Amino acid sequence: MQKLKTERQTDVSIIVLTYCQENYVSQAIDSILMQETNLKYEILAGDDASTDGTPDILKSYAKENPEVLQLILREKIVGDSYNFFDLLRRSKGKYIAVLEGDDFWLDSHKLQKQF
């Protein structure tokens, strides 16, 4: 009997909420990507119809990191609550971490320590 291949479950889903944060969002995403961890994680970035360069910056990161970053671009403003709960619904992780688009993690071992 042949065994089915099973993909390792995502340990942590990192939810990033953005709205007009072009000056900060790169630092936020970079602080996630610099994590030194053996955890399998995904990044779900939900942009709430930003009118600045935030969507373009996120598209660039999604193109460079398609295996880990899932991008949801809203065409009209839906608000923080809807944006958050939609990303939560889409998440596959056993655990959830939240990072606002204008914030960043200083510790490159944050995920490993926290989870």
Regions found by a protein language model. Name each.
Residues 1-115:
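Nucleotide-sugar donor-binding/catalytic module of glycosyltransferases
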